[in-house]
Amino acid sequence: MSIASFRCHALSVVTALTVQDSAGIENTTVVDSDWLEDQARTILEDMPVRCFKIGTLGSIENVAVAAEIIADYPDIPLVLDPVLTSGHSDEFGDEEMVSAIYELLLPQTTLIAVNSREAHRLSAPPDEDEPDSILPFDECARRLLETGCEYALLTGVHESTATTANELYTIRGRVRRDEWDRLPGSFYGSGDTLSASIAACIARGLEVEEAVRQAQEYTWQTLAAAFRPGMGRCIPNRFFWTQLAPGNK
């Protein structure tokens, strides 16, 4: 829905089947890596693609297959949202999968979008001398960008602050910082909305920094207009803009 809001067409490849509701994920079945590859290559042989967006992969095998496919299309930008930590602080993927993402996917990534907890998991391996230390944003970003990744967007959604500060880094350092009023409530899918929106903006030809700006604005609006259809968290209203059209009430 986020991608459609930017007038792009999403071509989905299923990586995992989940049992979930508005509160969270209860169980996951990972798709076999051969199936993942067949899905992706069938689509890529049929239609032109302007941007890749990778979310949950679920297994080391799927990480490896995704990396192989991406390597065959070096001119297509890649937005990586690895989904290593949920909104309820649940951790997904063991350290071997985290290492596989770091070693195989990050070097091919145009932009990685992660919250502070995910950034720390990816940039601070558990075998370091101080595994419980919390790295600052700039150090997390530096370690992520050392792999060859071009941009790192670190979001402050999990920080205990009055505003949410998102920071975009390149190997030169921080290139933009955006602060957003922290909205009341708990949201399900805010990170997915942001990364999908960035991918859509890049697909439409925007430079990365402008894509990040527009995607943040869109995501904040979806959260401001969020609704709560069940007993769990609020769902971003990705089509909020239709309610702002003249004549709509």
Locate each region found by the language model.
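Charged C-terminal helix
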Residues: 209-249
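Phosphate-handling active-site elements
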Residues: 9, 75, 174-176, 201-215
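Short pre-catalytic strand/loop immediately N-terminal to key active-site residues, enriched for Gly-Thr
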Residues: 175-188
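Short glycine-enriched, charge-decorated loop/helix-capping segments at active-site entrances
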Residues: 24-30, 90-95, 125-131, 183
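Conserved N-terminal subdomain of the carbohydrate kinase-like
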Residues: 1-87, 241-247
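Short, small-residue alpha-helix embedded
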Residues: 121, 185-208
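Glycine- and other small-residue-rich loops at beta-strand/loop junctions that grip anionic moieties
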Residues: 54-55, 90, 155, 187
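Conserved phosphate/ATP/ADP-binding segment of small-molecule kinases
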Residues: 93-175
